[in-house]
From Swiss-Prot:
It is found in: Cytoplasm. Residues 8-288 form the tr-type G domain. The lineage of its organism: Bacteria, Pseudomonadati, Pseudomonadota, Betaproteobacteria, Burkholderiales. One of its GO terms (biological process) is ribosome disassembly. It comes from the Bacteria. This is Elongation factor G 2. GO terms for cellular component: cytoplasm.
Amino acid sequence: MTRRTSIERYRNIGISAHIDAGKTTTTERILFYTGITHKLGEVHEGAATMDWMEQERGITITSAATTAFWRGMAGNYPEHRINIIDTPGHVDFTIEVERSMRVLDGACMVYDSVGGVQPQSETVWRQANKYGVPRIAFVNKMDRVGADFFRVQRQIVERLKGDAVPIQIPVGAEDHFEGVVDLVKMKAIIWDDASQGVRFEYRDIPPELQAQAEQWREKMIEKAAEANEALLEKYLSGQPLSEDEIKSGLRARTVANEIVPMLCGSAFKNKGVQAMLDAVIDYLPSPADVPAIIGHDERDREIERHPADDEPFSALAFKIMTDPFVGQLVFFRVYSGVVKSGDSVLNPLKSKKERLGRILQMHANERREISEVYAGDIAAAVGIKEITTGDTLTDPAHVIILERMTFPEPVISQAVEPRTKADQEKMGIALNRLAQEDPSFRVRTDEESGQTIISGMGELHLEILVDRMKREFGVEANVGKPQVAYRETIRSTVTDVEGKFVKQSGGRGQYGHVVLKLEPQEQGKGYEFVDAIKGGVVPREFIPAVDRGVRETLNTGVLAGYPVVDVKVTLVFGSYHDVDSNENAFRMAASMAFKEGMRRAKPVLLEPMMHVEVETPEDFTGNVMGDLSSRRGMVQGMEDIAGGGGKLVRAEVPLAEMFGYSTSLRSLTQGRATYSMEFKHYAEAPRQVAEQIIAARGSGAAARG
C-alpha cells in the first residue's frame, strides 16, 4: 500500500483554548466541513460515504486524535490530511496540554471575542513556546455582545508577547456579524446561513470598512515582506506583492515562529471555520517543514531522524487510553519510517519488544483499521502491553531514544482504600492503568502503614482520578485527607563526613569506610554523585555501592523523613579490608555518612508553592486579596479583566494553605469568583511552619531511625 497523501500535505495540529472559548464547537464544525468535502470528493469514485454527517450534528471528539481531509474552502486545494490532536482547557491538566504540544507541528489558538486572553491561555502559550510550536489565532464568538477582535489582537501582543498579524478583519459584530474581509485577496467573504456555511461568496469590501482594511493589509504585507531579502527589496521599492508572495512570506515567518496570523469567526453560526482550515494549510508547517527530530542511541550518542519513509521507524507514544471495546489504545506519532500491523517494535526505555497487533485511525466518531502508517502519521495501536506515556517506539535494528517528555513531580498525596474486599483487587488494576495513562499521577504503598498512597498535581486532579476509578472500573474507594509533598535539602557545604560500618564477629566480617563531602545544588538540579577517589583507597567495584547507599537514604530526610533533593555528594576518601569488605558494607557506610552530613549541613524543609490566579468581581477584590495574604500568599499583581469583567489577582501561595480554597472562595464572593492554580516551584518553609510539620511527623527521621 502506498501513501495516499504526500507528507508535505500533512498538518498535525492542536486546537487549544480556554474552557469557554468554544473549542468543542470549533472542532465539531471542522469535522462537519471536512466530512462534507470528503464526501463530495469521494461519491463519484463510488467510495463509502461518511453518512454519520446526516445522522449526527453534535460530534465531539472523545478520541485523543482524529483525522480529517480538506480540499480548501472553494475546493481549489489538492487534498490535505489534517490530524487534530485534542488538548484540554483546564489548568490542572497542564500535563495533557504538554504532552500534546510535544507531538504537534502547529497549533490553532481559539480565543473568545469578549474574554480574550485568559489565565489558561497564557499557560498554553508558554508550553507552545517551550516546544517551539508555530501557531495561528482564531477569535471565536464574534456574534457575542461585546465582541472586539482588535482588543484580542492587542492582548496577544501585550500579554503573550506574540506578534499577532490580522489576515482578516470582521464584517460587522455582535448580532450584525456577517463575515470577514480577507486582507490577502482584499475581498469580503459572506457565508450562506441556509447551507450551514458550506456555500459562501466573495463580495466587494463594504465602503465603511475600506480604509480600515487597507490599513491592516499594509501592516500584514510589511510583516510578510520581512521573510526574505527579495520580498523586502520589492516591497521597499514600492512594487505590489502578489497573493502568492504575501502567502509565502507569511508562511515562512509563521513556521519560523516569528508571527501569529489572526482570523475571526463564529463557529456556532457557521462562519469563519472554513477559512481557518485554509489558513492551517497556508501557514502552518507540514512534518517536512519541521527540523529532524533529535534522539540518542544506546550509547547515548546524539542521532537524528528525518521525516521520511525510507528512514528507520521511530515514534513517540503520547497518550494511553483504556477503551471499553478494544482494551488499551496507545496513541503514537510517527517521526520517521513505516510500520505495518503485526510488526515488532522496540520500547528502548523498557528494553521490551512489542508486537503491534492492530493499527487504528480515528475519524471523528468512527475508527478504521489500517495496515500501515508512515512518517508524519498519528494513529492508535492495540496490543502493546508495557508502555508509559512519553516512551519511544523504534525499529529494533536501528534504536533511537527520543527526548523524554518532562513530567512535573506530584505535589499532593492522599491515602486511598477500597470500601469492600471485592474492590481491593480491582483498585490495584485501576490505579495502575490510570498511572500508565498519566505520568503526573503516582501510586505507591506506604511501608509503615501499608496504605495505598496516590499523588498528583492538585486536589482536582486526584478527585477526577478517583471519580474515573469509580466510573470506568467500578471501584468504590474512601479517600483520606490530602497531604502536601514536602522535601528536604541542605544550605551549607560540609567536608570530611565519615561513615564506618564494621562487624567482626568470628568468621567473615563486614568492613566499609567512606569519607564524603556534601554540597547544596541549585534548585531543580537534583542529586549528583561524584567519585573523587585517588590511589584506589576504595576499590572501583565498591563505588556504585556507595552511590546506591546514598540514593537509598535520600528517600528519608533527617528533619521529618521527607525525600531529600538538590544535593551533590562527593566520595573523597575511604579504606577497605581485603577479606571483610563487600558491597553491602560500603552501602551501609555511605548511608551512615550521608545522614551525619545532612545533620551538619543546615538541613531545611521545602514546601511546594503554587501560582494562583483568581478572577473576581471588583467588589470582592479586597476580600480575595486579604484572604490570600492570610494564607501566607504573596500577591504579585492585579489587572482589569477585559470587557469590564472585574479583576484578575495573581499570587504565589503555599499549597498547604490552599486546601478547601474553592469552598471558602465561593462564600467570600457569593460564588461569583473562579480560580486556577498550578505548581510553580519549591521554597524554604518559614521556621515556625517547619517546626510544626516536624513536630507533627514525630520528628520524622528520629521516629524512623
